[in-house]
Swiss-Prot record:
This is Eukaryotic translation initiation factor 1A, Y-chromosomal. Residues 16-26 have a biased composition (Basic and acidic residues). Residues 22-96 form the S1-like domain. Keywords: Cytoplasm, Initiation factor, Isopeptide bond, Protein biosynthesis, RNA-binding, tRNA-binding, Ubl conjugation. It comes from Pan troglodytes. Belongs to the eIF-1A family.
C-alpha cells in the first residue's frame, strides 16, 4: 500500500474564511425574537440560554451557524422564539463583544447583562487566598 504523501484534503485547498475583520451592520430584534445570554452548552447543537425577558430556554443552533460560528457560554445571541413551544428557541445570530456593547449602549440589552465577563466562580475577590503556616521551613531543611 502506498504512503500518504499529500498535505490534506479539499478543506486545505479552500483555505480559511477570514471575515472577522469586516464590520457588519448591527441587527436589532424584531417581533418573535429575543436577546439572550448563553448559560450552558449542552452539545449536539443545543444550548441553554437565559433570555432577557426572564425565561430560561433550550436553544437549537441552526445549520447555517453550526460549524462556522463558535458559541461559548456568556455570549450574547439573538434567538427566534417558537409560536408553539415557549420553552424552546432557535439561535439566529451571535453578537461579538463590540456589537453587544453597542446594543447595551442603545438600551436594547438590560444593564445587568454581563458582556465578555466569564466569571464562573461568582462574586468575590480572587486576591484573598489564605495560606496556613504549618511550621518554620528553615527547621525542616536543616533536619534533612
Amino acid at each position: 500500500m502506498p504512503k500518504n504523501k499529500g498535505k490534506g484534503g479539499k478543506n486545505r485547498r479552500r483555505g480559511k474564511n477570514e471575515n472577522e475583520s469586516e464590520k457588519r451592520e448591527l441587527v436589532f430584534k424584531e417581533d418573535g425574537q429575543e436577546y439572550a445570554q448563553v448559560i450552558k452548552m449542552l452539545g449536539n447543537g443545543r444550548l441553554e440560554a437565559l433570555c432577557f425577558d426572564g425565561v430560561k430556554r433550550l436553544c437549537h443552533i441552526r445549520g447555517k451557524l453550526r460549524k462556522k460560528v463558535w458559541i461559548n457560554t456568556s455570549d450574547i445571541i439573538l434567538v427566534g422564539l417558537r409560536d408553539y413551544q415557549d420553552n424552546k428557541a432557535d439561535v439566529i445570530l451571535k453578537y461579538n463583544a463590540d456589537e453587544a456593547r453597542s446594543l447595551k449602549a442603545y438600551g436594547e440589552l438590560p444593564e445587568h447583562a454581563k458582556i465578555n465577563e466569564t466569571d464562573t466562580f461568582g462574586p468575590g475577590d480572587d486576591d484573598e487566598v489564605q495560606f496556613d503556616d504549618i511550621g518554620d521551613d528553615d527547621e525542616d531543611i536543616d533536619d534533612i
